Design a protein with these regions (language model features):
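Active-site segments that bind and position negatively charged phosphate/pyrophosphate groups
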Residues: 91-171
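A glycine/threonine-rich phosphate-anchoring loop and its flanking beta-alpha core
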Residues: 6-96
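Short Gly/Thr/Asp-enriched flexible loops that form oxyanion-binding sites at enzyme active sites
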Residues: 1-4
Length: 171
């Protein structure tokens, strides 16, 4: 980042982080969201994604269904604290979200077309940070809970991934 190197990403699992301009970094045990620069290209080979561990695909699914809580949290922050709120990313996510949820079992079984839906919505969610200039599009209270687990569970950390923790916090 500091050297401003240009990079591209070749995805091995569906994930919204590939298309964001931020990075969650642990610094002295505390998670911080830092500004990063965007990849010049993000490439998704659905055959590769269909072979990723099922647990990671489920984590990606969980990390995008948090849209419901993130949107409500962000809107409440706007109404109560006058923070900026932009609904545009949610209009874009709505184009695919219901179909993705209906295809959850097909995603779990590695169906290429269903994985394409998950991948598309993950990319859109990540890209939402580019035109809103905030991670609020898909990261609010549920992500805070996940980061809290990572920072403070120490020896009793359950070994769950970020997406798994976000999914549980969303429920």
């Amino acid at each position: 980042f500091l050297e401003k190197k240009v990079y591209s990403v070749f995805a091995t699992t569906p994930m919204n982080a590939y298309t964001t301009g931020t990075a969650s970094i642990s610094f002295k045990g505390i998670k911080k969201s830092l500004v990063a620069h965007y990849a010049q290209g993000v490439f998704f080979d659905l055959e590769v994604l269909s072979k990723c561990p099922k647990r990671l695909t489920a984590a990606a699914f969980a990390d995008v269904i948090c849209r419901t809580t993130a949107q409500v949290d962000w809107l409440m922050s706007h109404k109560l604290l006058n923070t900026d709120y932009q609904p545009t990313p949610y209009y874009l996510l709505a184009l695919y979200e219901n179909e993705m949820i209906k295809n959850a079992s097909s995603i779990a079984s590695g169906d290429i077309n269903a994985l394409a839906l998950l991948t598309r919505i993950s990319a859109i969610m990540g890209l939402g940070t580019s035109f809103t200039q905030t991670t609020h599009v898909g990261s609010m209270g549920e992500h805070g809970i996940s980061h809290y687990i990572d920072m403070f569970a120490k020896d009793i950390h359950p070994g769950t991934s970020h997406g798994e923790q976000v999914g549980i916090a969303t429920i």
